[in-house]
């Protein structure tokens, strides 16, 4: 076993390396490219990126009990692979993600087994304040949910997409941003996917790269 002073030194090296890689992370530079610029092994950069994602996941899980009120947009989307047509409903090989966006606020996401009512409704009741205004896509599984405890508006894209209030543009914007971020990884294994999903949630919720970096420095203690 290494003496404690060597263990402390190793920890300091890891913290310094994480500090060096964090700016590349918030700028969406891949771990391989960050490793090339920093002159470190790609596996080391990937390890530091994973540490950052683990820290992000930890803090977002701690904040998961926050209840959304006011206008909210729940929706589900499939991630992984390619398929023709609109978002699937748990197509084979895909990961189903349920999201709730608070208007002018944050988004919350969770991986679910399927988009059935018995799966999604408990999440809605836990995360959304009763009597809140809920906007759902008329073509999504969420539209079939029993949301009798809320003020429910069903959005028909062909008729109301341009309406100033009656829309689900917020959650749709998140899905588009998340899929753009994840696309560059060229495939993510199902076990690691929740960490990458929370990375997307973090990027969406915490604005500019400079703000994200300050938050990561605080969370990582660097």
Which sequence ranges carry the predicted segments?
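Residue-level recognition of single "structural anchor" positions
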Residues: 1-222
């Amino acid at each position: 076993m290494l003496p404690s002073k060597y263990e402390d030194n190793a920890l300091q090296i890891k913290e310094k390396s994480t500090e060096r890689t964090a700016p590349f992370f918030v700028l969406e530079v891949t771990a391989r490219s960050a490793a090339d610029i920093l002159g470190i092994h790609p596996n080391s950069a990937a390890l530091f990126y994973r540490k950052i994602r683990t820290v992000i996941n930890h803090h977002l899980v701690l904040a998961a009990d926050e209840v959304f009120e006011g206008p909210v947009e729940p929706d589900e989307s499939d991630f992984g692979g390619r398929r023709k047509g609109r978002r699937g409903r748990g197509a084979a090989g895909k990961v189903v993600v349920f999201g709730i966006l608070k208007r002018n606020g944050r988004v919350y996401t969770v991986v679910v087994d399927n988009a059935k009512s018995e799966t999604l409704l408990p999440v809605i009741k836990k995360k959304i304040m009763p009597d809140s205004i809920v906007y759902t896509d008329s073509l999504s599984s969420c539209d079939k949910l029993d949301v009798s405890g809320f003020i429910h508006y069903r959005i028909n894209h062909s008729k109301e997409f341009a309406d100033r209030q009656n829309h689900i543009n917020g959650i749709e914007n998140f899905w588009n941003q998340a899929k753009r971020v994840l696309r560059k990884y060229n495939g993510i294994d199902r076990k690691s996917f929740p960490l990458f999903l929370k990375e997307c949630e973090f990027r969406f919720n915490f604005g500019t790269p400079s703000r994200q970096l300050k938050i990561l420095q605080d969370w990582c203690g660097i």
